[in-house]
């Protein structure tokens, strides 16, 4: 009997050591030393009762120290965010057995590489609803991501109910038809497109004020800041459906519904119209009331300017301001809204187009273009150049971070617009590529971009987001010198099983 007892003990130790060697954390921590044995606790959930906590101001912001010994678990952090991220690590370490949780013995010292670790969800083209958004928030938190960029307005749909402006959802939250699933968008010329429609009404879909506040509160409990985007002065066809007088040529607005075509509508806000300014100030006041984020995204991308060049009111504004080019009107409205938001203690963020027209120096730029001819053809100020000029930047080159692009999977059942970002390309992304060392402090981070022209529902969304957003989480959290794609794939084999067990429609690994 004594001999059998020793055999059992050795087997248990071997099994525990094997589990420690197979630790698979995503994103990878800054430092980790695996130990021998494990800590076992009754129960099936990771909560604050399972560890001892100590506040330590020496730990970096959002960072933590974690020690799992056979006798218990201890966590140290300087702030609640660090404590929360330690708990996410514990959730990934936990192995559920019959009525107990087992944690491999390990010591971890961890903190993020970047401050801005985000994901964009586009609900202008397709609407997913708050439960799907909450699910995305849960998964972001699980991967230590901290910014949800919520794209709430588009040519194809207006998704927020603004008090005193019922027409926005009455006319802007639905469209009479949508592009047919599987149909391909054809470019017929500058800002001219064609695609087969399905003839089916889409919507009305929108969020009430209570819905918006619920999502903001839900995210805050998970240490995620919700940054709302109201895209101006282009991508506004849904608002123009509600208020045709806000565009340069109202007589051209014959359909009082959102845009039915993918691509960019040439109907944009009239910058020469004082009513446009009043409208935007009222919308952004509501946004400030609902969203506590210091940063408010004002879009600014892909704005066609042909109507401004012909519009008498825009011409009058140009003459009054001494402008020689219609494009300067975009800089004017950017600065006007930035000043208005500054009165509310807020800071604007916009796509890189805003940087070409003298944006305020405290504006945050979001670099998406790789060449100046993209979008509306505005002068390209690259992310690296903008950082050198002193702008804080979120780096999002579409060739690296637009996860609505194809994944390179054989037999992929979902539709994509084009482009290719396989998992290894997503993982190789460097937000500081090309940025001179002295300007890297201005690179806040990056985010996964989930544009929804070809994302039709929550299953489609999850498939395209994960596992590439796992790669993004590691790009933004893990120290660059610690990154290793082969090791990431090894960890992802186990981590993907976790995600699937959680109900995530995670795409296969290569």
Please place each PLM-identified region on the residue numbering.
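Acidic, contiguous N-terminal accessory segments
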Residues: 2, 9-11, 19-117, 347-351, ...
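Active-site neighborhood of glycoside hydrolase catalytic domains
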Residues: 239-245, 249, 257-363, 369-385
């Amino acid at each position: 009997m004594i001999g059998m007892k020793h055999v059992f003990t050795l087997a248990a130790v071997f099994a525990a050591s094997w589990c420690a060697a197979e630790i698979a954390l995503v994103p990878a921590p800054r430092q980790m030393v695996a130990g021998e044995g494990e800590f076992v606790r009754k129960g099936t959930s990771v909560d604050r009762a399972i560890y001892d906590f100590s506040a330590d101001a020496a730990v970096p912001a959002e960072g933590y120290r974690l020690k799992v010994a056979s006798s218990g678990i201890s966590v140290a952090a300087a702030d609640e965010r660090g404590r929360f991220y330690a708990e996410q690590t514990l959730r990934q370490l936990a192995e559920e057995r019959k009525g107990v949780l087992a944690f491999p013995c390990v010591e971890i010292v961890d903190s993020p590489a970047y401050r801005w670790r985000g994901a964009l969800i586009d609900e202008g083209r397709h609407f997913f609803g708050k439960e799907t958004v909450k699910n995305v928030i849960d998964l972001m938190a699980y991967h230590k991501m901290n910014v949800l960029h919520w794209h709430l307005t588009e040519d194809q749909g207006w998704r927020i109910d603004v008090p005193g402006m019922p027409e926005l959802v009455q006319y802007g939250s639905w469209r009479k038809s949508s592009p047919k699933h599987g149909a391909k968008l054809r470019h017929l010329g500058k800002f001219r497109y064609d695609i087969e429609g399905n003839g089916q009404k889409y919507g009305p879909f929108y969020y009430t004020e209570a819905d918006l506040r619920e999502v903001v509160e839900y995210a805050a409990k998970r240490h995620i800041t919700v940054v709302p985007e109201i895209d101006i002065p282009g991508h506004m066809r849904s608002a123009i459906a509600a208020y045709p007088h806000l565009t340069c040529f109202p007589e051209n607005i014959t359909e009082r519904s959102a845009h039915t075509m993918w691509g960019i509508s040439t109907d944009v806000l009239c910058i020469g119209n004082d009513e446009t300014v009043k409208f935007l100030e009222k919308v952004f006041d509501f946004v400030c009331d609902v969203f506590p984020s210091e940063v408010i995204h004002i879009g600014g991308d892909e704005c066609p300017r042909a109507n401004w060049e012909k519009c008498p009111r825009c011409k009058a504004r140009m003459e009054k301001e001494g402008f020689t080019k219609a494009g300067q009107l975009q800089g004017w409205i950017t600065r006007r809204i930035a000043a208005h938001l500054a009165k509310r203690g807020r800071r604007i963020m916009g796509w890189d187009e805003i940087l070409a027209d003298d944006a305020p120096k405290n504006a945050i730029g979001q670099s998406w273009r790789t060449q100046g001819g993209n979008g509306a053809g505005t002068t390209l100020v690259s992310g690296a150049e903008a950082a050198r000029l002193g702008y804080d930047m979120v780096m999002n080159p579409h060739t690296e971070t637009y996860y609505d692009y194809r994944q390179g999977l054989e037999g992929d059942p979902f539709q994509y617009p084009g482009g290719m970002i396989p998992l290894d390309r997503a993982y190789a992304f460097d937000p500081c590529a090309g940025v001179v060392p002295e300007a890297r402090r201005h690179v806040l981070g990056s985010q996964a971009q989930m544009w929804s022209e070809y994302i039709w529902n929550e299953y489609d969304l999850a498939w395209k987001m994960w596992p590439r957003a796992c790669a993004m989480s590691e790009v933004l959290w893990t120290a660059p010198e610690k990154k290793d794609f082969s090791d990431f794939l090894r960890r992802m084999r186990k981590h993907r099983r976790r995600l699937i067990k959680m109900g995530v429609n995670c795409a296969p690994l290569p």
